Amino acid sequence: MVLSDSLASDTRFDAVLIGAGIMSSTLAVLLHELDPEMRILIVERLEAPALESSSALNNAGTGHAANCEFNYTPCHPDGSINIQKALVINSAFERSLEFWASMTELGKLSPKTFLNLVPHISFVNCEEDVLFLQQRYKKLSAINAFRDMEWSADKEELSEWIPLIMNNRNPDQKVAATRVKRGTDINFGALTLAYLETLQESGAVELKLSTEVVDISRLQEETWEISLANTAGTYCVQAPFLFLGAGGGALSLLQNSGIEEGKKYGGFPVSGQWLVCNDSKLVKMHHAKVYGKSAIGAPPMSVPHLDTRWIGTERFLLFGPFAGFNTKFLKNGSNWDFLRSIQFSNFAPMIQTGLRNFDLIKYLIGQLKLDHDDRIAVLKDFFPEARSSNWTLSLAGQRVQIIKKTSKGGVLKLGTEVVTSSDGSLAALLGASPGASTAISIMLEVLQRCWGKKMSTDIWQKRLRDLLPSFGQDINHDKSLLDKLRNRSDSLLGLR
C-alpha cells in the first residue's frame, strides 16, 4: 500500500474509495481478495485513517449484534415485540465475525489487536420495563441465534453480573437483566488500520491522506473524474467505479455527484458526548456493555449504556452517548455542512420530517440544556454511587440521520442505507447505527449491486465461499450451519 500526500503518479484506477474508515477499508480488502490485480485508490481528507466515526471514542456503539440493544426489538402498540431487525443484525454481525476469522486464518489479521470478549447486558429498573424485558427475553431466547441469552431478576445474581450498577441501589426498585456472554467489544479504528496493513504489500492500493475531494463529474466514456486537492496541488483521477464512504460527509459527496438517485436524500446531524471514567478501580469493576431503554424521541445512537471498551491495551469505561445538535456532518467538518445540503429536491421532505418528528427535536433541545451535574444524574440511574469528580466529558463522533423523500413525503430513516447509481458505477453509504458492526454485509450489498456480473462468475463465487463459508445460506433458519459457523469463528478469533 502506498501512502502519499503528493500528486498522483497515476491518474487511472479501477476503483476510487472516498474516506479511509471502516467502510472503505472493508470494501478495499474485499475487492483486493476477489481481484488482486485491481488498482484501488483510497482518499482521506484527514492526516490519518479512521479518525472520524471509526475511531474507538467516536463510535456510538461497538459490537452490535442485537443482543442487548432495545431499539432493534421495538414494541408495537398492542404490546407485541418485533424481533425481525434483531435477527437481521445478528446474522450480519456473524457474517463479520466469519470474515475476520477467515482473514485471521490467512494470517492477515490478529484479532487480539481489535476484538475483546465482553458480555452484552440489557438492564431495566421499573416494573413496566421488567415486563417488557421478560417478553423480549422469551421471544429471543426461543430463537437459535439467541438461545444462550440468560435472564435474571435476582438481585444477588445481578450483583455478580453488574456490581457497579447494583451497589447501593434502592432495595424496593424492580430490576431485571438479560446477558449474552458471547458479546464483543471491537475497536474499529484498529481494525481499519489492520485492514490497510494487509494491503501494504499488494502494490495495488494507494492511500492519499490530507487530500480533499473538490469535485466529482461524470465523463462521457462512462468514467468518474474526481478532482482532488492537497498541499502539493490540485489534480484529477479517473475510475469506472466510485464509492462514497466518508461517514457523515457521504451525503454532500453524493449530492455533488449529481446522480438522480441521490436527489431524494437529506440529512439531519446529531452529535454525541461521552462521560469517561477516570477512576481505574471503577473501570476494573465493570466488565460488560450494559444497555438501558432510551428516552422518547432519542435517536438510536443515543441509547444510554455503561460501556467497557479497549483502546489499544487500555481499558475504558464510558457512559452515554448524550446527544446534541450542531450543523456539522463530520466531527472535523464545517458548520455550513447542514445548510449546504439543503437543496430544492430535498427541502420539502426535510421540513415534513421535522414536523413529523417533534419528539426528536424536543429530545435534542433537552440534551443541549444538560450540564455536567445533569449528566451525572442520568448516570446515577445506572450507577447509583457515581461521583461527579470521577467522570469527564468527551466529544464523540458526528452522525447524520437519513431523511428520504418517499410517496408519503419526507421520512426519517434509521440505520444505514446504500445508494447506487442506475448503472452501478457509484455507491454511497448513508446513515448511522449499526454501521461498522455489519460492514461486511453492507459491502457485500455494494458488490452485488455494483459488481453484479463479476459476483456471478465462478471465480468470485468460489473466492467468496472461501472467505465466507456460509455465503449464500440463511444461518437464521439452519441450526447446524449457525453452530458450525460460530464454532469456527470462536475458535479462530479466541472467543471461547
Curated annotation (Swiss-Prot):
Pathway: Carbohydrate metabolism; tricarboxylic acid cycle; oxaloacetate from (S)-malate (quinone route): step 1/1. Its EC number is 1.1.5.4. GO terms for biological process: tricarboxylic acid cycle. The keyword Flavoprotein applies. Keywords: FAD, Flavoprotein, Oxidoreductase, Tricarboxylic acid cycle. Its cofactor is FAD. It catalyses: (S)-malate + a quinone = a quinol + oxaloacetate. It comes from the Bacteria. One of its GO terms (molecular function) is L-malate dehydrogenase (quinone) activity. Pfam families: Mqo. InterPro entries: FAD/NAD-bd_sf, MQO. Belongs to the MQO family. This is Probable malate:quinone oxidoreductase. The gene is mqo.
